[in-house]
Amino acid sequence: ILMKTKKSISFFISLSVIFCILYIILAIKPLGKEYQFTPEWKIDVASPNVKPLKDDSQLVYFKLGQTMGYFTEDGDVVNFITFPFKASISDYFYTSYTANNKSAKFYSPDAKQLGTIDILGFPMMDKDRIYVFLPGGNAFAVCNQDGTKKWEYSGFSPITAFDSSANGCVVGFADGNITEFDTNGN
């Protein structure tokens, strides 16, 4: 039995070595064309060169660490803001807030103050929509574009998911419920 085992082990080792050699030889093929991205421009976010906004420029917003702002497709930074705690930014608005935020001023991409949100909570900007997640984690408010409260919803379970569109919003709760609201809160 020992002799038979030695022969079978040497057979399988030899077979494995032959398979590996054949695999290496047959698997060799030239690599396809590789695509490499080369940047058209770079921005040093430690000390950006802020330039005035041109009227025909399409703005792109960014949030990186404790900084946020807007830049053009040409790479010109037109607004650069540092914030101490948290912030929210969209194509139309930006704001920063603290952990015990009682109100938050919000601004347009060109740094003009558009209004104040006088609701205790955490603002979220999504395109041209303003939401405030209220303390406790189970409620939110929808605001008008001047920051005044339009309507509010309070649930029993904490909010775990949220998405909005021009037609309303969808909220997911920790108990598994998903609720859809139109723009009027129905």
Predicted regions mapped to residue ranges:
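A generic short-segment signal for beta-strand/edge and adjacent turn/coil regions
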Residues: I28-G32, T38-P39, K63-Q66, A99-K102, ...
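Sequence/structural signature of beta-propeller modules
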Residues: L2-M68, E73-D74
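Amphipathic, soluble alpha/beta structural segments
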Residues: F11, I117, D128-Y131
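Extracytoplasmic/periplasmic C-terminal soluble domains
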Residues: Q145-N186
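A generic structural signal for ordered alpha-helices
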Residues: D118-G121, M125, F140, G147, ...
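Short beta-strand elements that form the blades of beta-propeller/WD-repeat-like
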Residues: N49-Y70, F85-N100, A104-F106, F122-P135, ...
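A short beta-strand motif characteristic of beta-propeller blades
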Residues: Y35-I43, D74-T82, K105-D118, G147-S154, ...
